[in-house]
Amino acid sequence: MRLAVIGGDGIGPEVVAEGLRVLRAVHPKVDTTEYDLGARRWHETGETLPDSVLEELRGHDAILLGAVGDPGVPSGVLERGLLLRLRFEFDHHVNLRPVRLYPGVRSPLAGDPAIDMIVVREGTEGPYAGAGGVLRKGTPHEVATEESLNTRYGVERVVRDAFRRADRRERRHLTLVHKNNVLTKAGDLWSRTVAEVAPEFPDVRVDYQHVDAASMFFVTDPGRFDVVVTDNMFGDILTDIGAAITGGIGLAASGNLDPSGVHPSMFEPVHGSAPDIAGRQLADPTATVASVAMLLDHLGHAEEAAKVEAAVASSLADRAAAGAAQPSTRERGEDLAARAAG
């Protein structure tokens, strides 16, 4: 496995080190190359993602990212210059976010709900494609537009990916989330595409939720969802709700995928760089380790992925039973690696 590693900023390098520890515990044949990308590089050189580095990244099987950013970088610089550029250059059209409440993890929701879903979010279109503009900026007559771009090609490939994932899961249930009563043009495209692809997956039950209703049900009845497919912006919002109801973004993993394998997919914890605790071994690497499980599964190493996922689940359960003890970042990583290897 040829793995590009972007530790990034703040706690990023610390949690990535433990993710690599766990990865090597189950898959020793890993050839890693580290890249200095993020806020530090921007402060020193003004660069976000040089073309030469982009071409080097292209030659890897996958990318493991820690976290990027610090308060001194203007908003949008790293998001568009690094993260979104990687997404568009490598055609990461599927953003995959598991939403699972592990045994022993407390949810802010009452009643210990059963939560186990995945959100398949379109990653390269919608309002984040960068279309739009500003007229008469700074005047009382300023006009700002952000356009949502949705193509049949882009929608269909994400819908098919979601159906394939639903077809492999026990419940075989797919929910399309959109707002087709107001966003009638894009909503119609999404709804028609789901309806036209559905006959190819006769065992998958399909339903629809408006995004406002889905947001409510994520909180009041999350067990009704199995696989959710949605557009870029709605998925961005729903997945953060999903993280909040399953222990917080500190446990949330994600994958930015090109399912075809033509380009390297990127895996990362959802949390930020947390510069206030950087270098103090206080960060929890669990989300990074869960992202490693997704990386392994994506590259076809299902058995190793299952071992890492089981290690995460057992560690979280034991952690809840142990109470207030707070191991260091390294200690958590060593424990997870031992569980995965054993």
UniProtKB/Swiss-Prot annotation:
Reactions mediated catalytically: (2R,3S)-3-isopropylmalate + NAD(+) = 4-methyl-2-oxopentanoate + CO2 + NADH
EC assignment: 1.1.1.85
Ranges of Basic and acidic residues composition bias in the record: 329-342
Alphabetical UniProt keywords: Amino-acid biosynthesis, Branched-chain amino acid biosynthesis, Cytoplasm, Leucine biosynthesis, Magnesium, Manganese, Metal-binding, NAD, Oxidoreductase
Annotated residues for binding of NAD(+): G272, S273, A274, P275, D276, I277, A278, G279, R280, Q281, L282, A283, D284
InterPro entries (UniProt xref): ICDH/IPMDH, IsoCit/isopropylmalate_DH_CS, IsoPropMal-DH-like_dom, LeuB_actb
Cofactor(s) recorded in Swiss-Prot or TrEMBL: Mg(2+); Mn(2+)
GO cellular component: cytoplasm
Coiled-coil ranges per UniProt: none
UniProt site (Important for catalysis): Y128, K179
Note describing how the cofactor binds: Binds 1 Mg(2+) or Mn(2+) ion per subunit.
Region of interest called Disordered, as start-end residue ranges on this chain: 319-342
Molecular function in Gene Ontology: 3-isopropylmalate dehydrogenase activity; magnesium ion binding; NAD binding
Binding residue positions for Mg(2+): D212, D236, D240
Pfam family, one: Iso_dh
Chain ranges passing through the membrane: none
GO biological process: L-leucine biosynthetic process
Keyword Chloroplast: no
Biased composition (Low complexity): 319-328
Pathway in which this enzyme or protein is active: Amino-acid biosynthesis; L-leucine biosynthesis; L-leucine from 3-methyl-2-oxobutanoate: step 3/4
Positions bound to substrate: R87, R97, R121, D212
Alphabetical list of NCBIfam families matching this protein: PRK03437.1
Family: Belongs to the isocitrate and isopropylmalate dehydrogenases family. LeuB type 2 subfamily.
Oligomer status and interactors: Homodimer.
Name the record gives this protein: 3-isopropylmalate dehydrogenase
Biological source species: Frankia casuarinae (strain DSM 45818 / CECT 9043 / HFP020203 / CcI3)
Gene that encodes the chain: leuB
